């Protein structure tokens, strides 16, 4: 079973590309969605223990957590030590199910693919990218986003140029959704051909 790692910096269109892969029939494990799910349940008391006052009605108050992290950027390490093992556990459960179901390939949407070393456990890396001005416009249009918050997030992510350099495939989201979809379908078609040729014998 071929494991495709999908990544891209904030505002590049990674989530949209992930959905396009899923629409094309590729099973998707979305790390962001898993974190949202964990914050609404299992991880909430653990996060609250490390960041007092961040739990509200049994779930993580993301706004309060973000406020505390902005004041103490070192807190990201504590948060990741709590969340990453839980996300990894869910990922392994997803992979086991897809393997049992006979999936030919799966997509792992991992925002911090390079930063966490997750790139080592995938067979192919797809990076989503766009022009830096388009990226900035998209991100600053989000609710509760500021220039300072955007710059802080970027500082924690591998630079786009480095991601592009390490990609096996690149999806450019600078243009229309139709053009983005065409790129995704082309990648899937090529990967299916490569699987048939035996390019991924260890996958």
Swiss-Prot record:
Q: Does the keyword Nucleotide-binding apply?
A: yes
GO BP annotations of the record are:
coenzyme A biosynthetic process
Q: In this record, what's one Pfam family?
A: CoaE
Keywords (alphabetical) are: ATP-binding, Coenzyme A biosynthesis, Cytoplasm, Kinase, Nucleotide-binding, Transferase
The family database entries (InterPro entries) matched by this protein are listed as:
Depp_CoAkinase, P-loop_NTPase
A GO molecular function term, named singly, is: dephospho-CoA kinase activity
Task: List its EC numbers.
Answer: 2.7.1.24
Location(s), subcellular? Cytoplasm
Source organism, top-level taxon: Bacteria
Main location, first listed in the record: cytoplasm
GO cellular component annotations of the record: cytoplasm
Please list the residue ranges annotated as the DPCK domain: 3-202
Please write the reaction equations for the catalytic activity of this protein: 3'-dephospho-CoA + ATP = ADP + CoA + H(+)
Q: Which ranges does the record mark as transmembrane?
A: none
- Biochemical pathway: Cofactor biosynthesis; coenzyme A biosynthesis; CoA from (R)-pantothenate: step 5/5
Task: Give the top-level enzyme category.
Answer: transferase
State the function annotated in the UniProt record: Catalyzes the phosphorylation of the 3'-hydroxyl group of dephosphocoenzyme A to form coenzyme A.
Q: What PANTHER family does this protein's entry cite?
A: BIFUNCTIONAL COENZYME A SYNTHASE-RELATED, DEPHOSPHO-COA KINASE-RELATED
Q: Family assignment?
A: Belongs to the CoaE family.
Descriptive protein name: Dephospho-CoA kinase
Species of origin: Rhizobium etli (strain ATCC 51251 / DSM 11541 / JCM 21823 / NBRC 15573 / CFN 42)
């Amino acid at each position: 079973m071929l494991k495709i790692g999908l990544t891209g910096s904030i505002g590049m269109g990674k989530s949209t590309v992930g959905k396009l892969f899923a629409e094309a029939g590729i099973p998707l494990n979305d790390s962001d969605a898993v974190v949202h799910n964990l914050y609404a349940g299992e991880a909430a008391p653990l996060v609250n223990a490390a960041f007092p006052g961040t739990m509200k009605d049994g779930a993580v108050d993301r706004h309060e957590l973000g406020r505390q992290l902005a004041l103490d950027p070192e807190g990201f390490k504590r948060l990741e030590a709590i969340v990453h093992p839980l996300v990894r556990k869910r990922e392994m459960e997803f992979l086991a199910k897809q393997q049992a179901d006979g999936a030919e390939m799966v997509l792992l949407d991992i925002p911090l693919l390079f930063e966490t070393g997750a790139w080592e456990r995938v067979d192919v890396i797809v990076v989503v990218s766009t022009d830096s001005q388009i990226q900035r416009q998209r991100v600053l249009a989000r609710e509760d986003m500021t220039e300072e918050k955007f710059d802080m997030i970027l500082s924690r992510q591998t630079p786009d140029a480095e991601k592009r350099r390490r990609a096996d495939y690149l999806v450019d989201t600078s243009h229309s959704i139709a053009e983005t979809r065409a790129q995704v379908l082309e990648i899937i078609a090529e990967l299916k051909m490569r699987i048939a040729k035996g390019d991924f014998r260890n996958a």
